[in-house]
């Protein structure tokens, strides 16, 4: 029996538009609720949300069998950390601040068993292999790994074509906020030079045959990124949605006469 098929990876490769949402509460119950909305993918955020290995593992568990595919964003691309979340059952990783083809190649290798990589083979301890109940897991897992790298600096943009040429990079996610900050526009990704850079990057990603991803929260920007070619598009953040709805509801009834 082989490793479970990563249907998100195959959908990305086909160019389907996949709509996602950030799961930032670091809580399995909240992530399970979010999955009932039917998003194609959910980011379990280990970079800016208060997640650790146990909370990530718990969220992976509640998403098993759900339509929403878990994308685990790690705080960094360290091989030991990659190994742990893959053993916990993740198949798709989003790695921030990738700025070179060399970094991308190292990430590809960290996600794969030898001879294609350096992932440790302790699968008997791992949920990923159903605790050794999938006899062919190690032999087949490499083909189901999906690597998404974040390009969010000028250095990353300069190296984009080389990153896209790395075998094993399934998609590139543009980080508008950090890119804008690195270009001298802290907190304002709407500046013309930032927008032009994003549009060009998304086009180059799709031309290279890779999936292009990005996050936006307002309707106009979401439509613009979609029209520019983004095909794994995050359209919400759960923490933001709760905060906005809570404030709007209270404001409405405080002022109602």
UniProtKB/Swiss-Prot annotation:
Which organism encodes this protein? Roseovarius nubinhibens (strain ATCC BAA-591 / DSM 15170 / ISM)
Instruction: State a single Gene Ontology molecular function.
Output: aldehyde-lyase activity
Q: Which GO terms describe its cellular component?
A: cytoplasm
Family, as annotated: Belongs to the HpcH/HpaI aldolase family.
Domain of life per record = Bacteria
Q: So what does this one do? A: Aldolase which can catalyze in vitro the aldolisation reaction between hydroxypyruvate (HPA) or pyruvate (PA) and D-glyceraldehyde (D-GA). The condensation of hydroxypyruvate and D-glyceraldehyde produces 2-dehydro-D-gluconate as the major product. The condensation of pyruvate and D-glyceraldehyde produces 2-dehydro-3-deoxy-L-galactonate as the major product and 2-dehydro-3-deoxy-D-gluconate.
Pfam family membership, one:
HpcH_HpaI
Q: Which cofactor does it need?
A: a divalent metal cation
List the active site. 48
Q: Where is this site: Transition state stabilizer?
A: 73
**Principal EC category:** lyase
Q: What is its EC number?
A: 4.1.2.-
Cite the binding residues for a divalent metal cation.
Answer: 152, 178
Question: What is the reaction catalyzed?
Answer: D-glyceraldehyde + 3-hydroxypyruvate = 2-dehydro-D-gluconate; D-glyceraldehyde + pyruvate = 2-dehydro-3-deoxy-L-galactonate; 2-dehydro-3-deoxy-D-gluconate = D-glyceraldehyde + pyruvate
Sorted alphabetically, the keyword list is: Lyase, Metal-binding, Pyruvate
Q: What residues correspond to the site Increases basicity of active site His?
A: 87
Q: What is this protein called?
A: Hydroxypyruvate/pyruvate aldolase
């Amino acid at each position: 029996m082989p490793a479970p098929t990563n249907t998100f990876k195959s959908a990305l490769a086909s160019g389907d538009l996949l709509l996602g949402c950030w799961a930032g509460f670091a809580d399995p119950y909240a992530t399970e609720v979010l999955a009932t909305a039917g998003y194609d993918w959910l980011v379990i955020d280990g970079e800016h949300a208060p997640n650790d290995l146990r909370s990530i593992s718990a969220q992976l568990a509640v998403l098993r069998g759900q339509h929403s595919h878990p994308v685990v964003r790690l705080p960094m691309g360290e091989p030991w950390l990659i190994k742990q979340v893959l053993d916990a059952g993740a198949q798709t990783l989003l790695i921030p601040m990738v700025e070179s083809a060399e970094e991308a190649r190292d990430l590809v290798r960290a996600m794969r068993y030898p001879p294609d990589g350096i992932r440790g083979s302790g699968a008997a301890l791992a949920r990923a292999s159903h605790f050794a109940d999938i006899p062919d897991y190690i032999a087949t897992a490499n083909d189901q790994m999906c690597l998404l790298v974040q390009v969010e600096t000028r250095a990353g943009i300069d190296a984009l074509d080389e990153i896209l040429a790395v075998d094993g990079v399934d998609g590139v996610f543009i980080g508008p906020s950090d890119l804008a900050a690195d270009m001298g526009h802290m907190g304002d990704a709407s500046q013309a030079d930032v927008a032009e850079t994003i549009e060009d990057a998304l086009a180059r990603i799709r031309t290279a045959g890779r999936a292009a991803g990005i996050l936006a929260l307002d309707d106009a920007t979401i439509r613009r990124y979609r029209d520019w070619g983004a095909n794994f598009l995050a359209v919400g953040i759960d923490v933001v949605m709760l905060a906005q709805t809570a404030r709007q509801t209270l404001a409405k009834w405080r002022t109602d006469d």
